[in-house]
């Protein structure tokens, strides 16, 4: 009998990508496997089944894949949070700090109505900078982030702590500590 795969078994680790010393967690192998992908989407939803959610927001780019699937399961709308300059029409922007500089994410200025309840989804929680910027955009439009769901948490990088200090609920399916 073949041992049952865990979610981590579906995630490929690629050493020294995109830079030497980085252990890249490649979730495309999980997305390519129908069973693994289904398990991931179901588990991302699990803590939120009894929570009223009006929309799901996904962070570029793999958060679009996960967030779209989660929104479909919930029968709610999906809102992409994109890198600067990628959305047509009127947008609002939020800068965030990277290790060596800064970046910007945007959403359409009419993406949320005041009072809407939003679940933020992405594949990876590292430093939390991108997620925090996404939360700030959602809140600037008057919506409420009811939680954040990630496939992977890299706790050594402090993202969970950052989001929890914002009183944000964080749900991650697996973590990779210093490996």
Curated annotation (Swiss-Prot):
Its EC number is 2.4.2.7. Disulfide bonds: none annotated. Its main location: cytoplasm. One of its GO terms (biological process) is purine ribonucleoside salvage. One of its GO terms (molecular function) is AMP binding. NCBIfam families: apt, PRK02304.1-3, PRK02304.1-5. This is Adenine phosphoribosyltransferase. The gene is apt.
